[in-house]
Amino acid sequence: NLVQFSNMIQCANHGSRPSLAYADYGCYCSAGGSGTPVDELDRCCKTHDDCYARATKSYSCTPYWTLYSWQCIEKTPTCDSKTGCQRFVCDCDATAAKCFAKAPYNKENYNIDPKKRCQ
Protein backbone atom coordinates (compact mmCIF):
# COMPACT_ATOMS: atom_id res chain seq x y z
CA ASN A 1 0.00 0.00 0.00
CA LEU A 2 1.07 3.63 -0.17
CA VAL A 3 2.51 3.70 3.36
CA GLN A 4 4.57 0.59 2.68
CA PHE A 5 5.73 2.07 -0.64
CA SER A 6 6.80 5.24 1.17
CA ASN A 7 8.79 3.16 3.66
CA MET A 8 10.39 1.19 0.81
CA ILE A 9 11.51 4.45 -0.79
CA GLN A 10 13.15 5.47 2.50
CA CYS A 11 14.83 2.06 2.73
CA ALA A 12 16.23 2.26 -0.81
CA ASN A 13 17.39 5.89 -0.70
CA HIS A 14 18.75 5.52 2.85
CA GLY A 15 16.50 8.35 4.04
CA SER A 16 18.32 10.88 1.85
CA ARG A 17 15.09 12.37 0.42
CA PRO A 18 11.60 12.37 1.95
CA SER A 19 9.07 10.19 0.15
CA LEU A 20 6.77 13.17 -0.37
CA ALA A 21 9.44 14.78 -2.58
CA TYR A 22 8.41 12.24 -5.21
CA ALA A 23 4.65 12.85 -4.87
CA ASP A 24 4.41 15.77 -7.29
CA TYR A 25 7.34 15.19 -9.59
CA GLY A 26 7.31 15.18 -13.38
CA CYS A 27 4.37 13.86 -15.38
CA TYR A 28 3.90 10.49 -13.66
CA CYS A 29 4.95 10.82 -10.00
CA SER A 30 1.49 11.93 -8.91
CA ALA A 31 -2.12 10.88 -9.45
CA GLY A 32 -2.81 10.06 -13.06
CA GLY A 33 0.00 10.68 -15.50
CA SER A 34 0.21 11.46 -19.18
CA GLY A 35 2.58 12.46 -21.94
CA THR A 36 6.28 11.78 -22.13
CA PRO A 37 8.24 11.33 -18.89
CA VAL A 38 10.49 14.35 -18.28
CA ASP A 39 13.53 12.37 -17.06
CA GLU A 40 14.80 9.08 -15.64
CA LEU A 41 13.03 9.50 -12.30
CA ASP A 42 9.73 10.26 -14.02
CA ARG A 43 10.26 7.10 -16.14
CA CYS A 44 10.53 5.16 -12.87
CA CYS A 45 7.09 6.50 -11.94
CA LYS A 46 5.60 5.65 -15.34
CA THR A 47 6.95 2.11 -15.06
CA HIS A 48 5.43 1.90 -11.56
CA ASP A 49 2.06 3.15 -12.87
CA ASP A 50 2.18 0.56 -15.66
CA CYS A 51 3.05 -2.16 -13.14
CA TYR A 52 0.06 -1.22 -10.97
CA ALA A 53 -2.17 -1.32 -14.07
CA ARG A 54 -0.94 -4.87 -14.78
CA ALA A 55 -1.64 -5.85 -11.15
CA THR A 56 -5.18 -4.50 -11.42
CA LYS A 57 -5.78 -6.31 -14.71
CA SER A 58 -4.11 -9.62 -13.81
CA TYR A 59 -5.29 -9.97 -10.21
CA SER A 60 -8.36 -7.70 -10.01
CA CYS A 61 -6.82 -6.09 -6.94
CA THR A 62 -6.35 -2.50 -5.80
CA PRO A 63 -2.57 -1.91 -5.61
CA TYR A 64 -2.78 1.36 -3.65
CA TRP A 65 -4.47 -0.44 -0.75
CA THR A 66 -2.93 -3.92 -1.02
CA LEU A 67 -0.97 -4.91 2.08
CA TYR A 68 2.08 -7.13 1.62
CA SER A 69 5.00 -8.42 3.64
CA TRP A 70 8.50 -7.02 3.06
CA GLN A 71 11.76 -6.21 4.83
CA CYS A 72 14.54 -3.68 4.42
CA ILE A 73 17.64 -5.88 4.17
CA GLU A 74 20.96 -4.06 3.81
CA LYS A 75 19.12 -0.97 2.54
CA THR A 76 17.30 -2.99 -0.13
CA PRO A 77 13.51 -3.52 -0.13
CA THR A 78 12.90 -7.28 -0.19
CA CYS A 79 9.46 -8.84 -0.66
CA ASP A 80 8.31 -11.67 1.62
CA SER A 81 4.80 -12.09 0.19
CA LYS A 82 4.77 -15.27 -1.86
CA THR A 83 1.78 -15.24 -4.18
CA GLY A 84 -0.76 -13.35 -6.22
CA CYS A 85 -1.59 -9.69 -5.97
CA GLN A 86 0.45 -9.11 -2.80
CA ARG A 87 3.67 -10.38 -4.36
CA PHE A 88 3.06 -8.57 -7.65
CA VAL A 89 2.36 -5.21 -5.97
CA CYS A 90 5.29 -5.64 -3.59
CA ASP A 91 7.58 -6.29 -6.56
CA CYS A 92 6.20 -3.18 -8.32
CA ASP A 93 6.95 -1.05 -5.26
CA ALA A 94 10.39 -2.55 -4.58
CA THR A 95 11.46 -2.09 -8.20
CA ALA A 96 10.25 1.52 -8.20
CA ALA A 97 11.93 2.32 -4.87
CA LYS A 98 15.27 1.01 -6.18
CA CYS A 99 14.78 2.95 -9.42
CA PHE A 100 14.07 6.16 -7.45
CA ALA A 101 17.26 5.65 -5.43
CA LYS A 102 19.39 5.42 -8.60
CA ALA A 103 17.76 8.20 -10.63
CA PRO A 104 18.90 11.82 -10.34
CA TYR A 105 16.40 14.19 -8.71
CA ASN A 106 16.02 17.40 -10.73
CA LYS A 107 14.36 20.10 -8.64
CA GLU A 108 13.12 21.86 -11.78
CA ASN A 109 10.88 18.84 -12.44
CA TYR A 110 9.09 19.12 -9.09
CA ASN A 111 5.59 20.63 -9.14
CA ILE A 112 5.60 21.29 -12.89
CA ASP A 113 2.63 22.44 -14.95
CA PRO A 114 1.43 19.22 -16.65
CA LYS A 115 -0.52 21.18 -19.26
CA LYS A 116 2.73 22.68 -20.51
CA ARG A 117 5.23 19.88 -19.89
CA CYS A 118 3.30 16.60 -20.18
CA GLN A 119 2.13 16.50 -23.79
From Swiss-Prot:
One of its GO terms (molecular function) is calcium ion binding. Keywords: Disulfide bond, Secreted. GO terms for biological process: arachidonate secretion; lipid catabolic process; phospholipid metabolic process. Gene3D superfamilies: Phospholipase A2 domain (1.20.90.10). SUPFAM superfamilies: Phospholipase A2, PLA2. GO terms for cellular component: extracellular region. It holds the Pfam family Phospholip_A2_1. It is found in: Secreted. Expressed by the venom gland. Residues 107-117 are annotated as: Important for membrane-damaging activities in eukaryotes and bacteria. It comes from the Eukaryota. Disulfide bonds join C11-C72, C27-C118, C29-C45, C44-C99, C51-C92, C61-C85, C79-C90. Belongs to the phospholipase A2 family. Group I subfamily. D49 sub-subfamily. This is Basic phospholipase A2 homolog 1. It comes from Notechis scutatus scutatus (Mainland tiger snake). The lineage of its organism: Eukaryota, Metazoa, Chordata, Craniata, Vertebrata.
